[in-house]
A protein has these predicted regions:
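Acidic, small/polar-enriched beta strand-loop surface segments
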Residues: 4-7, 14, 201-353
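Beta-strand-rich assembly/attachment modules of structural machines
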Residues: 1-122
């Protein structure tokens, strides 16, 4: 069975007006929860006409790129870099690298102090997006559900003197104790056919899908990786915040949390493993303490992120699977008694078919 064709639609970032649909090859894409997705594609340049079209349509930092698989949108983002290549035969190609919509927020700073007191953390995120969009040239059409709430209120002040990047402070807000997950999804509205950039929020995590998919090895799972990593483990933690000194003539020292210790793990015989983190823009002791507690909780028993490579002609998968639950069943020499567990999909990388290579998806999982 033939896989649906991939195509790249280039649009104006601010208006989403289509600029061109160029022929592409060697497409790859990935998307994640908690991390900016990436995509790349090569535009073959066999003649002057195609080269002129590519030059006119692709203006890095100003152009939006949508990747379609058949009738569906599978990825959206912004091309930030490109590489023009010529081989020994003089064959030209333009390799485009793009970051997901959230990468735009790496290029937006808080230049006017923003303050929230007793505000739901989802509203703080939406307020930051509204602030970003309110400035001239800053609206790229990110949509959201204004009624969605997390039930957790926060006090936050983002000072213009710190010039923090918008994505950085959203990530900090998400990763604090009692935080949330967020991403900006891409899809086509089923009614109007309009391309959508949608803010997706979930507290404490993003969950999607009503029915789980079963993946077996041997079976649709072609291969897997199961990383085991103790380098990020810690049972003692301390975090540093902003300086609490307002006197420029005196020595400036950062605010510090109390030393957090997992006594139960040390009593169980574990060696002491120290961990630290820096939050140089955090000025409130309670906020810094919440960051430290969240960091220790993640480091005491770090979760492995298994990776499964799945044949897409054996099981229907798409980027809409992010946040969904899958049931993984593996039987081999390591899992001699058989593994049968449920996991949540937190990342997905697609490799389209290429020169006899089947179309595959690599799933990144965490315990459900």
């Amino acid at each position: 069975m033939m896989s649906p064709a991939y195509r790249v639609v280039l649009c104006d970032l601010r208006t989403d007006q289509v600029l061109d649909i160029l022929p592409v090859s060697d497409v790859s894409l990935d998307d994640y929860i908690g991390k900016v997705g990436t995509a790349s594609a090569t535009v073959p340049l066999p003649n002057r006409q195609i080269a002129a079209r590519a030059r006119a349509a692709l203006e890095l930092g100003r152009t939006a790129m949508w990747i379609e698989r058949g009738p569906d949108i599978w990825w959206g983002g912004i091309p930030w870099t490109a590489d023009l290549t010529s081989d020994a035969r003089g064959t030209l190609g333009l390799r485009i690298q793009a970051g997901g919509w959230a990468s735009y927020l790496d290029h937006r700073a808080v230049l006017h102090t923003q303050q929230a007191v007793g505000v739901d953390q989802f509203d703080i995120v939406r307020g930051l997006l509204d602030y970003s969009a309110s400035l001239t040239g800053g609206d790229i059409g990110i949509e959201y559900d204004a009624a969605e709430a997390s039930g957790v209120v926060r006090d936050r002040t983002y000072r213009r003197y710190d010039q923090p990047r918008v994505r950085e402070i959203i990530d900090q807000l998400a990763n604090v104790e009692g935080g949330f997950e967020w991403r900006i999804a891409s899809y086509r509205d089923s009614g109007s056919g309009r391309r959508i950039k949608q803010l997706q929020l979930g507290a404490p995590v993003i969950r999607t899908g009503e029915s789980e998919i079963v993946l077996d090895h041997p079976g649709p799972i072609l291969s897997y990786g199961w990383p085991i990593d103790a380098t990020v483990r810690a049972n003692v933690w301390q975090s540093r915040g902003a300086s609490d000194n307002r006197n420029q003539t005196a020595e400036s020292l950062p605010m510090m949390t109390e030393l957090l210790v997992d006594d139960a793990q040390l009593a169980a015989g574990w060696p002491r493993l120290d961990g630290t983190s820096d939050y140089t823009t955090v000025t409130e002791p309670a906020t810094l303490a919440a960051h430290a507690r969240a960091d220790l909780a993640a480091a005491v028993n770090p979760r492995p992120i298994p990776e499964l490579t799945v044949a897409l002609d054996r099981v229907p998968l798409s980027p809409a699977l992010l946040g969904a639950t899958v049931r993984v069943r593996i039987r081999d020499l390591w899992w001699a008694e058989g593994l049968d567990r449920r996991y949540r999909v937190v990342g997905l990388a697609i490799s389209p078919p290429l020169r006899g290579r089947p179309e595959t998806a690599k799933l990144f999982l965490e315990a459900a």
